[in-house]
Amino acid sequence: ATKRIPVVTLKYQHGFKGFLGGDFTYDRVTLKAYQTFRLGTLGRSDYTFTAGYTPSNLPAPLLFPHLGNETFFFVRSAYSTMNYFEFVSDQFASIQYNHNFEGLLFNRIPLIKKLKWRFIASGNILMGSQRSANHEIMKDVNSPLRSKFLDQYAFDSLDPNKPFAEVGYGIDNIFKILRVQAFHRLTYLDHGNPQRFRLMASVNFSF
């Protein structure tokens, strides 16, 4: 449903060292805004804006690991061309935008019109950074988290002056339930073993 104003969620978390086995005391604040709206005959759009900050010095898994996706199944809140735990930040801001053109394009093609396919497009942009103090925690050879996480995943930080960006496009409403999308990574193309192109699918059941 179209939302005339964004739905805003503000979340604060405090961790207590020693409580339920916790190793750190920390504070985290996360802000999220979500809205759907129509663009007249152009179709409908939705966006999710998210920002987070922690002043605490913590190992990477307790900061803000950005959600990557290495599968072929589309996950709406994930970055489709980002690897698992490829980037982590202690402060970040992101926007994820999706647009459904509805019948604007395919309804002009007689045979395709009967199938009721819908052309979709999306774009994700993420800005973030990580303080050097948090980098050093994961470099500590005495850290119990080092062998468990650091050797398996990158946990790198983003350049605060260079966003992570990706775009996608595809077809929705195939057989009324299937969506197929292609995604292109636009930045950090030489970072590790990047996923420059991904083809993904998802299934949506409506009752």
List the model feature ranges, each with a label.
Residues 1-207:
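Exposed, low-structure sequence patches enriched in small/polar residues
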